[in-house]
Amino acid sequence: MNIDTHDNGWTIIVNDINLKEANDNEAQIIGSLVATNTVVVIQNQNLTASEETAFCGKIGQVESYNERLAEAERTELDEAGKTLYNKVKGILEPNTDNSVIRVTAEHDDQGRPGLFGHASELDWHCNQAANSWRDPIVWLYGVKGTQGSRTSWINTIMAYNDLSDELKREYADIKTINGYSSEGGYSEEVFHKAGHDINTEWTPNMVHTNIAGETGLFFPFLQMHQVVGMNEADSKEFIIKVRDHLLQEKYMYHHDWQDGDVVISEQWLGLHKRWHCDTMDQRVLHRVCFNFDHIKF
């Protein structure tokens, strides 16, 4: 295994590794780099879904929909509940312990599309921004039809480090209210305007230190509804100011997909965006969420 750094100075590129055969020590190194550098890229892989989760499981506990599906199966669902249950079953790759999500418009053998199969951009976001139990890592694997599509990432550790000492002090005690509803849309214009799952009970700090001791900004600006203690107008002005700081090119990594690519990213101190893609009915990514439970820091 060889480790290089991308030309942007922070994204990690791992070469000369077959993740099917990766050992615990290699997983330890890769997991640690995800936490410290926020994005790790590994190319030229040929993995089954089970091999994907096997590697992710070397880094931490892999998220599964088993309990949620089992609870739904025990419940007398109304029509809306049945529709949601069927939708969730459709986004999951079969025979993977309900842990691998298909990101695609391609239909499964029962005619159900995967997650986020729309062609329009899926604008800047992170995993489960409104939930305290959120997994801190997202794995994306290019299964097929990925060429010509692009996903970009932001590193908020670097963005935080570039702040003045005065702004670091100002931001230290700021808390945010977050939420998201996919029914509201995916673009910057509408991403944060649907409101049925805003979480006012959990208000995370804007400045966050992750499990590796790296400090950055937890600031999912398109999933952010308000800043605690500010009115709507002041919140909007503040969010736009910080957003514009984060959207500087020097904090970004752009990935132009090829089949067999893996991108692993940390979800506290990073955001990602899928750009417009007209071939979502052919493009299939696998998405796995997990934590750092097996990594020693």
Ranges and model annotations:
Residues 2-264, 268-297:
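Fe(II)/2-oxoglutarate oxygenase catalytic core
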